[in-house]
């Protein structure tokens, strides 16, 4: 049976369009607020409302999938995201936009839970790494192309909202031509997020998603600031960020394939070790290009491998709940990491960004090394 079936390919096509819209809005919303002369703290609050929406959306999507299935949950998530986009054109204001970005955040989180859960339920322990790698490749490619779109088209609010909304609605179309079966509805017992978080045999996967959130959130949010403080121009900052993201895209498929072939525990150990090496290399500033490349290739691929590790430890009907737990863990890490790193950078030194990344990665590496010989056979193999 092919790894990339017709439903999987159509699902990824829809995700690409939705990710383009997400990237465009995430880039332009802060700029629109600044043009409206809102103070910086209000711009930050609007951004926080989006991430709060992500948390809320993550919590209830599993129940929704169980009730109405993958397809309808996907349609509903896309429509909620589209509503959050259209609402931005009603009125530019702090409370209005905070509400609409909260709604958009819910829709986006629902999309991620639906897509990730559908891919995991479609795969097996032998190909789930490649499926999640393809998901991350599409996600990062959509993010990259979204940045290109922002630089090529008019950034005016009322010019952008119509075609972005159209792109969101177009993202629904691929799934109208296929049906993703939700085998979880056949299970007698449903699983909760809290139960998945407490599952001992999957704890390394959960911790890996938290670490991944800390690493990626810090790199995405604070690397441009670090480079700016090194005296680089905006064009140079854009180039080095492109190197970082491109490395993440290029690393997805090989890492997924290696994880499926040689085991996720071994690949996770190598990835975390490489993240530590890349962080140390960034501190020396001896060779920024290779240092950033290996940091991106290893750091950006942690999440799908950690997910695949956790998902092979649960029964098939528990996959949706496990995915919610993993996405929630990643979100928490991506909120905590940049906040703590920014505080260290402001009060002490910019180099503490990479010291923090290396430190949390080292702690996770110790957890992975302690797990030697404790690798029970996967149960989610059907």
UniProtKB/Swiss-Prot annotation:
Segments crossing the lipid bilayer: 8-28, 45-65, 75-95, 102-122, 131-151, 157-177, 204-224, 231-251, 270-290, 291-311, 325-345, 349-369
GO MF, one example: transmembrane transporter activity
Cytoplasmic topological domain residue ranges: 1-7, 66-74, 123-130, 178-203, 252-269, 312-324, 370-382
Subcellular compartments: Cell inner membrane
Keywords from the named record: Cell inner membrane, Cell membrane, Membrane, Transmembrane, Transmembrane helix, Transport
GO cellular component terms, semicolon-separated: plasma membrane
Membrane topology term: Multi-pass membrane protein
Main location: membrane
InterPro entries linked: MFS (IPR011701), MFS_dom (IPR020846), MFS_trans_sf (IPR036259), MFS_YcaD (IPR023745), MFS_YcaD-like (IPR047200)
Pfam families xrefs: MFS_1 (PF07690)
Periplasmic side: 29-44, 96-101, 152-156, 225-230, 346-348
Homology family: Belongs to the major facilitator superfamily. YcaD (TC 2.A.1.26) family.
Xref: NCBIfam families: PRK03633.1
Protein name as catalogued: Uncharacterized MFS-type transporter YcaD
Organism, scientific name: Salmonella typhimurium (strain LT2 / SGSC1412 / ATCC 700720)
Gene of this entry: ycaD
């Amino acid at each position: 049976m092919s790894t990339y079936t017709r439903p999987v390919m159509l699902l990824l096509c829809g995700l690409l369009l939705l990710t383009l819209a997400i990237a465009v809005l995430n880039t332009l919303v802060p700029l629109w607020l600044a043009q409206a002369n809102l103070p910086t703290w209000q711009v930050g609050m609007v951004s926080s409302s989006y991430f709060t929406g992500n948390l809320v959306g993550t919590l209830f999507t599993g129940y929704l999938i169980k009730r109405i299935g993958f397809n309808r949950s996907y349609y509903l998530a896309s429509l909620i995201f589209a509503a959050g986009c259209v609402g931005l054109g009603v009125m530019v204001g702090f409370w209005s936009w905070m509400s609409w970005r909260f709604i958009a955040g819910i829709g986006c989180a629902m999309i991620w839970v639906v897509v990730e859960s559908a891919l995991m339920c479609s795969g097996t322990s032998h190909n789930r790494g490649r499926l999640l790698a393809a998901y991350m490749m599409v996600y990062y490619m959509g993010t990259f192309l979204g940045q290109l779109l922002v630089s090529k088209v008019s950034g005016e609010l009322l010019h952008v909202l119509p075609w972005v909304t159209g792109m969101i609605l177009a993202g629904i179309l691929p799934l109208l031509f296929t049906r993703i079966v939700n085998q979880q509805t056949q299970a007698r017992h449903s699983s909760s997020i809290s139960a998945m978080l407490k599952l001992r045999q999957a704890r390394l996967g959960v911790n890996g998603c938290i670490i991944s959130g800390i690493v990626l959130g810090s790199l995405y949010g604070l690397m441009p600031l670090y480079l700016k403080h090194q005296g680089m121009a905006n064009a140079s900052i854009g180039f080095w960020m492109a190197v970082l993201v491109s490395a993440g895209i290029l690393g997805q498929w090989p890492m997924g394939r290696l994880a499926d072939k040689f085991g996720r525990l071994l690949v996770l150990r190598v990835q975390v070790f490489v993240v530590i090496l890349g962080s140390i290399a960034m501190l020396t500033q001896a060779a920024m290009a290779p240092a950033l490349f290996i940091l991106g290739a290893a750091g950006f691929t942690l999440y799908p491998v950690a997910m695949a590790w956790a998902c092979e430890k649960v029964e098939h009907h528990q996959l949706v709940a496990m995915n919610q737990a993993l996405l929630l863990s990643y979100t928490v890490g991506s909120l905590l990491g940049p906040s703590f790193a920014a505080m260290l950078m402001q009060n002490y030194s910019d180099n503490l960004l990479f010291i923090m990344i290396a430190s949390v990665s080292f702690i996770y590496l110790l957890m992975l090394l302690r797990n030697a010989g404790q690798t029970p056979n996967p149960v989610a193999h059907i």
